[in-house]
């Protein structure tokens, strides 16, 4: 979804109109019945646009059934596993090129790939990131950014700054997904559930 920023909308102060990049349908993101609300620990956000809805939720939203979306088509297994393999390789490649990440690379890398433990954790948590791949422009880069953010936050012994780390935290929805991945990752590490 992209915000409609036409001169007419700006003149009348309408900043809640969005247009789907794929089907070109319009969405009024005002917390009403059209919004698909996602409850996070910090706030309530519209899943379609990523806008924070706290304090802007219309009462009619709670009177009917909660809207939800389903997958339109099945996931291609070969593409899914190919993407996982690329993700694991790219995570290590990115970390090897950054300064101050030697300790992290030693913890998670095995050659050009990740260790078996890290591989199992990524396999288990990747399902959380599927919505990002389907609806965001540059979805793969966002997913890489999420995993890099999670890995650096868990394995780093000092502060690491990189633009790739902050790409996933600009949008509340993607930040929420990254937090779910991190929570699941930490649970799997603490319970040795890999």
From Swiss-Prot:
Keywords: Host cytoplasm, Host nucleus, Signal
First and last residue of the signal peptide: 1-25
Superkingdom assignment: Viruses
GO cellular component, one term: host cell cytoplasm
Subcellular location: Host nucleus; Host cytoplasm
Alphabetized InterPro entries for the sequence: Herpes_UL92
Function: Plays an important role in the expression of late genes. May play a role in viral replication.
Family the UniProt entry places it in: Belongs to the herpesviridae UL92 family.
Assembly mode: Interacts with ORF34.
Protein name: Protein ORF31
Name of the gene: ORF31
